[in-house]
């Protein structure tokens, strides 16, 4: 049985910027990508990433405490992938990640 490679797009959502990383599961390689400004062009810019990398899966980090604006914006971003593009999204608990 051969192992099939998957491409994963990881997002560190923020109300001003969204951190982005791409990963390949077969080799375990990861690559940070340029930060996306979270403005009116955010979904257009995310679409460009999708066209370039064609990920199989999207990971979105979920922080332990969120403001209402943060929660609403993150929900819109998740819905963009799930409802608009029919992509699988996994939310990752950030409770025990480091803080800067």
State where each predicted segment sits:
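Phosphate- and other anionic-substrate recognition elements at nucleic-acid/protein interfaces
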Residues: 2-11, 15-100
């Amino acid at each position: 049985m051969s192992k099939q490679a998957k491409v994963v797009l990881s997002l560190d959502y923020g109300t001003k910027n969204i951190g982005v990383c791409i990963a390949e599961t077969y080799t375990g390689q990861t690559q940070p990508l340029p930060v996306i400004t979270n403005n009116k062009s955010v979904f257009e810019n995310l679409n460009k990433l999708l066209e370039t990398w064609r990920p199989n899966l999207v990971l979105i980090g979920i922080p332990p405490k969120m403001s209402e604006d943060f929660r609403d914006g993150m929900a819109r971003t998740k819905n963009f992938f799930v409802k608009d593009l029919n992509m699988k999204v996994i939310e990752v608990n950030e409770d025990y990640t480091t803080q800067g």
